[in-house]
Curated annotation (Swiss-Prot):
This is Uncharacterized protein AF_2119. It comes from Archaeoglobus fulgidus (strain ATCC 49558 / DSM 4304 / JCM 9628 / NBRC 100126 / VC-16). Residues 1-22 form the signal peptide. The lineage of its organism: Archaea, Methanobacteriati, Methanobacteriota, Archaeoglobi, Archaeoglobales. SUPFAM superfamilies: Invasin/intimin cell-adhesion fragments. Keywords: Signal. The keyword Signal applies. InterPro entries: Invasin/intimin_cell_adhesion.
Amino acid sequence: MKSVKIIIILALALLIQISHIADAKTYTVNFSSIGGLEVTPDSPHPKAWHRDTRDLPSNPYYTSDRTPFTQADIDLIESPDSSGFSSGGQDTHHFYFSIPQNANVVVRWRGHAQEDGDYVTLYYWDGSSWQKLEETTSGSWTWISGSFTASCEAHILAVGHDGSLEYTHPTSDYVEIEVSVANPLPVSVVKAEGNPRNYDGFFDTDTITLYAKVVSNGNPVPDYPVKFYAEFDSQRIFLGGAWTNSSGIAKLSFIPKNVGLSDKLRVNFVAKIEDVMTNCNAYTTTTNRAILAENVAITPGSYDITLVGRMYYSGGADWVRVNWYVDENSVLKPYPIPVVQKFTGNRASVTIWKYGLDDYCTDPNCHREGIYGNFDDADWDGACIAVGSTTPMCGRDVGGACYGDPDGPLKGRHDCTYFSGYRVGPFVQMNIPDHALGFLAAMVIQLFGGGELDDFMRATHYDQHEGPYGVLVSNAGCGALNPSTEQALTHGALGLFADPKGGLGVVGFVGLIADNEHAIGIMMGHRYGIHPFTAIVTTVPNYPSDEAGWRNYMDTWLYYLLNNAVYIAKTTGEELAAWSLRYPTQSDVVNLNRAFNDFITDFLPYMHEVLWLVVNCGKTVNHPFIISTFVQFKDNFEIVHRIMLNSTLNNALGNLISEVLLQLPNVVGPPDASTGINYLLNHRQYLSYSEREIFGYRMLQLLDQLTEVVVTLLKEIPLMEQSSRDNPGWDFNWIAGCGEG
């Protein structure tokens, strides 16, 4: 019986020993990284120094009289690649590692002395003096390995000697230690105070600061490496790393744009840790990941977006490529809430390339234009028009594309400082009014006094496109003007002067944006209202570079359009469903309402001007608008026809319809107005009475104008059937003003 007890006790002891062995964890440390962070001279550990005196190792291990290794030195000992580190006149290399108490340390060192016959000795510090560990007796590249026991700190010294026992220069190529720990302490990373709130928002040019805390059994752990990441859409960006302070707090500050993070509505900031030896302990992670902030929006501090689409106008339909550029000096935050931006004209521009008609007419005889235009007649070289200080193709005042410099005298004939726009969540709009053909258009037409349509058309001659070419207006006693200079009439006088804001008309874009790679919307523009156009545009990963490509681009473009629409529908639904979290306080949502008011009223003056032209200028303006609308219907039919005949496009359309229906409840919001558009509208009651009154008055003005426009166009449509010189109809050449019915 006694022997049985002994056997049981021995078995239990063996099991305990086996469990200890099973719990043992091996830590390997070199000078490459620790805890996932690159080792630098500023890291708490490991450390490395060199010294050029020859009395070591007799001195103790203190480092005050030694020189820290530089980052280049450390890089040379990250891996055994024979690149080596030679310290010049220095004779000793001192390496320090953090280890647990009473740890057995295995050392592996690789290097050599200078010549054959020289040798290198490794020493370790036993707590009171340097003790010889191992040495090599060859000057060639070699490994030295050994082991010793130490507590908390492992100090290793490499000293070179020549054959006459004089000191020589050792070259260290690689050094590492290995420690096996039976019972490492548990360690976790948790969220600390001071992080951005969930659903907060920043520009990508802002400075963001993150905080994480490392604890073990509830106690803070100093000198622990922490890595910080941004996670979004199953992707991860490394933001940087930091070591914990005496309170166990790691702090990292960064600028999103500098680390490749921009234009994301759903970003999680995360801290991660790995198993590390520090503070006389070895740690193994129980919680190695902590979310510091969820669903933070990173909004661009500048925009550079290229949109491609179909331009519909009174001459047919062509391809158009548009580049909107807004410098960071022109992107402002009008209210202290996330994802709301105001665009100004300090540094902004638009450039338009039209790939289509390069002549006045779409038929050989110059007799028919209008709805009979051949919209596949592409001129792939394109015609470029530009307004702004930064344009990707036209440059500065090249080929008629001009710009305004708000910091100096005006150069050229356009002033981009009238650029305006807003972004509110996924909604975006941008406007570039060219005031000579925008606000001044009404004045010019009033002063001109109407006249025959073909006379007016000849007075507003077009050369190639809507760009800044040709005579703007000729009047009695003035004669023809230089076609290279845009002109405008002075108010109430017959004289002419060069207008720095002339040439393009009004161009606007309104749409939805998930990020710079996913935007979709409608671009609208006109020149005196005579040559109106609209374009359905979207971002594309690539576009054609030759004529054949543009002629066969329709199906590819539709694929991008539909898939972008699916992604944007999903993003918009997710964003509006979270608006009560993005804008949690009454002050936040009231400011959001103000931003929406600004979003709409920003482009109302330009819309007012266009609608005035349609109503007051008769067939000079409203006939082109009618034709432009019918051309768009015609091309939309072509789009629908292509989608129905193409299974890939048909599936994409089905996905879009499904996603829109799925996200519609999120966009609208529930009856209790806790999210979505209902959440926004429910808080309009907290706007001041004057704010609501002014906005309501402007909306009623717009409704009144729209009603008047509809009535005017309904009256004019029957007249389009009566084509004559005095009353051109559907087939009039609205671009050249040929005057032939």
